[in-house]
């Protein structure tokens, strides 16, 4: 069956490269202004789930499957989460995954950018290059 996009993969992929996260954590530890504060980190790549999954699949010479609407994916996940454990198996689709890729989950990183001076140092192309390298 393969990977199916939810709502054509139109929603933003809320991605965060590990190095960019590490930089954010470093700023939280080393900057006094961060004491007792909460910050959100998310790369500003403006990449859709469709592009991200297409790029990942291409690394392995694969293509992504068709798309299903959010409501159908959520319904299937809801049923699977009940039915599969009854036969001792993990469901192939989870409601949490459907929500993560089938809705807009972007967050504001303005506070981290303003107060900590944080930004995405590693860009999308470099992050994808690193992922591809790790797969080989």
Located regions from the model:
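A short C-terminal helix-loop "cap" of Rossmann-like NAD(P)-dependent dehydrogenase/epimerase domains
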Residues: 1-7, 89-91
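Glycine-rich Rossmann NAD(P)(H)-binding loop
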Residues: 6-11, 39-46, 57-60, 101-103, ...
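Substrate-positioning beta->alpha
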Residues: 7-29, 36-37
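Residue-level signal for the nucleotide or nucleotide-sugar donor/cofactor binding architecture
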Residues: 13-19, 47, 107, 122
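Conserved C-terminal active-site "lid" loop/helix of NAD(P)H-dependent oxidoreductases
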Residues: 18, 51-54, 79-117
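Mid/C-terminal beta-alpha module of Rossmann-like enzyme folds, strongest
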Residues: 27-92, 129-130
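Amphipathic terminal alpha-helices
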Residues: 107-115, 119-136
